[in-house]
């Protein structure tokens, strides 16, 4: 038993080290303008993944380092840039939306029983379902810690609402899984909740950081 556990943790540590050594997600030409900002976000992510519980760091680094385009953080940064906000809080909030997104992926893969994501073994396949669920919970709670640090109730309201809507979307998808009567309106409602809501919240949070008017904030969210 002890030998098997030691082998598991050694393997997990190797995975964590490989993830930390991996380069940041490739930047498309359209996102080159925020390449330096994205490096700052990656630094915040690495710093705020710190935990005194080794398995938390191992699973977190594994899923964060597995690739992805960081589109939600990019949207927040681009909104801030378009509205003239250059404060450092944009890096923290960009990391927050990435943590929320990553938590949904961890939970999603457990619910779906997925073995692969982006061509690699999922976290639940590598570490097991219990670890994936609990580390997803850690990422949610860390995201909310960071929101509290920002001391902006409006941003907390927007991102808390988005997190709630995403969870409802996941439950709706589960309920509709074998429903042959589901129409396009019902399907669109699910994907608006599961996917579009966090994009909307990312743009809205960027506008709030920039001190945009309510009408401009809404325009960014609608976009």
Predicted ranges, named:
Residues 25-26, 33-35, 39-40, 46-223:
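Mg2+-dependent prenyl diphosphate-binding active-site environment of isoprenoid biosynthetic enzymes
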Residues 15-20:
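Intrinsically disordered, low-complexity activation-like regions
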Residues 14, 30-32:
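An N-terminal, well-structured beta->alpha segment
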């Amino acid at each position: 038993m002890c030998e098997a556990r030691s082998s598991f943790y050694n393997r997990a540590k190797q995975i964590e080290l490989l993830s930390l050594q991996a380069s940041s997600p490739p930047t498309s030409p359209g996102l080159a303008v925020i390449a330096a900002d994205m490096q700052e976000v990656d630094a915040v992510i690495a710093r705020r993944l710190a935990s005194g519980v080794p398995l938390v760091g191992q699973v977190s680094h594994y899923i964060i380092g597995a690739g992805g385009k960081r589109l939600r953080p990019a949207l927040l940064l681009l909104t801030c840039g378009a509205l003239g906000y250059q404060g450092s809080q944009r890096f923290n909030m960009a990391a927050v939306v990435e943590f929320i997104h990553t938590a949904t992926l961890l939970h999603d893969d457990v619910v779906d029983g997925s073995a692969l994501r982006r061509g690699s073994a999922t976290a639940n396949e590598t570490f097991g379902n219990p670890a994936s669920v609990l580390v997803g919970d850690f990422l949610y709670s860390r995201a909310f810690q960071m929101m509290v640090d920002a001391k902006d109730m409006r941003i907390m309201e927007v991102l808390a609402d988005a997190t709630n809507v995403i969870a409802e979307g996941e439950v709706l998808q589960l309920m509709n899984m074998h429903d042959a009567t589901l129409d396009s309106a019902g399907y669109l409602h699910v994907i608006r909740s599961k996917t579009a809501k966090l994009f909307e919240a990312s743009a809205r949070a960027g506008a709030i950081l920039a001190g945009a008017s309510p009408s401009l904030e809404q325009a960014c969210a609608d976009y």
